[in-house]
Amino acid sequence: MAKKIIGFIKLQIPAGAANPAPPVGPALGQKGVNIMEFCKQFNAKTQSEAGMITPVVITVYSDKSFTFVTKTPPAAVLLLKEAKLQKGSGEPNRNKVGTVSREQVRRIAELKMPDLNAFDLDGAEQMVMGTARSMGIIVED
């Protein structure tokens, strides 16, 4: 018989830097998951992408065991990295803070494709361009 799922936990954690401090500890502690075991497994799996924010979905089972799936970093984080910015604009419709090329947008869309609900690469590019626009980043052709 399959183990019964008692919940899902969605977190965004810096790759290779999970520790029992908030937000990881309290979220996992509520479900009774072994926090240190998760931290060790997550850090081992994501150490190659150190520093990037990595979304993770943790599935918790009735016997307090767990599995987790890591996703690609958020498009906003990838855009900030490509544009070499610290943060987006507070007023994106008035203040533009940086620019990215169409090739950079395509690269981000290719990386994000497994996690986006787009049928093709053009649709994924449009989603990434929309994220850039909402952050005050100009996309140049």
Swiss-Prot record:
GO terms for biological process: translation. The keyword rRNA-binding applies. GO terms for cellular component: cytosolic large ribosomal subunit. Coiled coil: none annotated. Pfam families: Ribosomal_L11 (PF00298), Ribosomal_L11_N (PF03946). One or more lysine residues are methylated. InterPro entries: Ribosomal_uL11, Ribosomal_uL11_bac-typ, Ribosomal_uL11_C, Ribosomal_uL11_C_sf, Ribosomal_uL11_N, Ribosomal_uL11_N_sf. The keyword rRNA-binding applies. Keywords: Methylation, Ribonucleoprotein, Ribosomal protein, RNA-binding, rRNA-binding. Forms part of the ribosomal stalk which helps the ribosome interact with GTP-bound translation factors. Belongs to the universal ribosomal protein uL11 family. Part of the ribosomal stalk of the 50S ribosomal subunit. Interacts with L10 and the large rRNA to form the base of the stalk. L10 forms an elongated spine to which L12 dimers bind in a sequential fashion forming a multimeric L10(L12)X complex. This is Large ribosomal subunit protein uL11. It comes from Chlorobium limicola (strain DSM 245 / NBRC 103803 / 6330).
